[in-house]
Each structure stands twice: as C-alpha cells, then as structure tokens.
Amino acid sequence: KIPVVAAGSIIDGRGLAAALAFGAVGVWVGTRFIMSTEAHAHQDAKDHMLDASIEDTIITRSYTGKPCRCIQNERIKRFEDNPDQIQKFPLQYMQTIQDDVFGTIGGKIKEINVNEDCLPSGQGIGGINDILPSKQIVDNMISQASSILTNSNNFISN
C-alpha cells in the first residue's frame, strides 16, 4: 500500500477531514502556513493576501517559467499580455531572482512590492481570514477535522 498525502486548498479541518475520508494518510498545507505569524513573508504580503479571493489569483509562468498560482499583479499582467517574453525554466526563474521580485517564495521580509513581487497562493486563499501562530493553525485543523469525522459516524449508524 502506497501512502498518499493530499494537497490543494487544504486550509482548515474540513479539508483535512475530507482528505482522510478519501484515504490520505496526511495533508500538505501551503498557503495557510504562509499566513502564519512565523512565516518568513513580509507583513504587507500577508495583509494583501488576507484581502484576496480565488478570483484574484492566476496560474502563471511569469516568475519561474513553470506554472504557479499567484495573486495577480501588474508584473504578471505585463507578462501575460506578452507571453512571448516569458522564458522557459530555469531562465525565467533566474530573471526573477535577478529582478529581486521573488517575494514570499524567496523569503523577502524587509521590503515587498505587491504589484511586482511573487505572492504564491492556493485556491483556498479566500477562506483564510486571519494570521495565526502555526501551532494554533494545526490545533484548530485537528480539532475541526476530529469533530467532523466523529460526527460523520452518526450518518452511517443512523
């Protein structure tokens, strides 16, 4: 039996419970932990992401040359309007590093420009409404998933 770890839009206990119910042995949580107090992301990036929804994201190759979902901004728009300017990986990635716009992926914590820097974001971004310590995120996730899975037994037994 091959263990499966679920990923994608897992931001709370509902996603964890669903993944476990489908047979996953665990989950990979991305965007939710960018929105934690310990994350090495600039506070302006976190604040900007708090205001975002799925409609504010786009899958783009403009930062690395490979597809990545990010919060839309002016840099992405310039590249998406001129896709021939997007280089293949690793050239686009190297250009992004040279331009110093790797944002939260690069661990930028001093200065960030939300109109230029990369703000990676999963589809669950609109469901994140606070910035919490990682321990609280995990505790909340486990508590909510446990409650959901316990209550789901009632559906089967009734």
Where do the model's predicted regions map?
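Conserved active-site-proximal phosphate/metal-binding subdomains
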Residues: K1-V5, I10-N158
